[in-house]
Amino acid sequence: MPRKHSEQLFRQAQKHIPGGVNSPVRAFKSVGGTPVFFHSARGAHLFDEDDNKYIDYVGSWGPMILGHNHPHVVAAVQAAVEQGLSFGAPTATEVAMADKVCELVPSMDMVRMVNSGTEATMSAIRLARGYTGRNKIIKFEGCYHGHVDSLLVKAGSGAIAIPGSPGVPEAVTADTLVLDYNDAASVTQAFKEHGDDIAAVIVEPVAGNMNCVPATENFLQTLRQQCDDNGAVLIFDEVMSGFRVALGGAQGHYGITPDMTTLGKIVGGGMPVGAFGGKQAIMEHLAPLGPVYQAGTLSGNPVAMAAGLATLNLISEPGFHQALAEKTTRLLEGLTAAAHAEGVAFTTAQAGAMFGLFFTDQNRISSFTEVMACDSERFNRFFHAMLDQGIYLAPSAFEAGFVSAAHSNDDIDATITAARKAFGKI
């Protein structure tokens, strides 16, 4: 499949854009090769600068649950644009959006709109610290919460955090405790040692940046119990899982109620939107009601709110998420059968319409350590074998995949057929 225009554009992009991309994973550094430059998308399909067509399982990294360019979402955006791009003032659309979010996510009494998932998690942590008067936070290895300094860390010696990126001073991460994902015992021990100082626990109930690793029920129940017993705030980062794992997010699926939730991706319908919210008692500490400051020039942007509201209304239709999950199951069962037919050690994970592909002989992956033990080089070869057949997967062994409502049975059948050939080559 020729991609000469992508190669030319990538060379040109590197002149003025660091690495030639505006977000690192897009550079194909994990899988090798040249990133694909796209010019348009419709439904479940992407079209690159050489007019090659791809079945898309990235979905702009999650937001495109309806598929690309859904006519109702496009119409809502066009109508909003005609009224003005931005006012920097309250609008009726942002009120309707807040009402809809709180309706769909019952744990959220109040919500504040922001411009990205990173901004949402950053603000939620600040608010939790302001509400509790404490400084320490717990996060889990392999969980990504945006490029916030205090959260961009990995586990060092024991639970002592060390910077995960140059430019992040150790002093900034000194109050961040990093524990193993799905390890309930480590959570209990951390609260035993630091309980009076822990402001919040932040967790992805479905970890989507170490591929796709759902939390165990016991793990989430332990988080809820320890936060209750010690007066800490439980934050579910549902930037990725929100409105995708289930209409009410992963928390609705698991039946575990957090104190705060962060949202992104689907909530903006493809526009740059994030949100954070939770219990009224906590949210009332946020300015202008309370002393914890947070602001944003483009927060609640009317065009973005129109896209998000149109998307949420469409995915609220009865049976939407069940049909999407069944479609995802059909895809994964087909991929697994294709791999095993070719003698390839392979397993999958699913959470609603999120999925993970693992090259391993283990039946289930539940921790960052297990993810790292998978054969990422074999994934890289699989990725390119699929790409050459017009199947666009996430260009990293550590990213989740997404199925949209626009994927047809023919799309899924074509993907499984391509996978059978790809498994045979790797």
UniProtKB/Swiss-Prot annotation:
The modification N6-(pyridoxal phosphate)lysine is found at K265. GO terms for cellular component: cytoplasm. Pathway: Porphyrin-containing compound metabolism; protoporphyrin-IX biosynthesis; 5-aminolevulinate from L-glutamyl-tRNA(Glu): step 2/2. Keywords: Cytoplasm, Isomerase, Porphyrin biosynthesis, Pyridoxal phosphate. Disulfide bonds: none annotated. GO terms for biological process: protoporphyrinogen IX biosynthetic process. It comes from the Bacteria. Its cofactor is pyridoxal 5'-phosphate. GO terms for molecular function: glutamate-1-semialdehyde 2,1-aminomutase activity; pyridoxal phosphate binding; transaminase activity. It catalyses: (S)-4-amino-5-oxopentanoate = 5-aminolevulinate. Its EC number is 5.4.3.8. It is found in: Cytoplasm. Homodimer. Belongs to the class-III pyridoxal-phosphate-dependent aminotransferase family. HemL subfamily. This is Glutamate-1-semialdehyde 2,1-aminomutase. The gene is hemL.
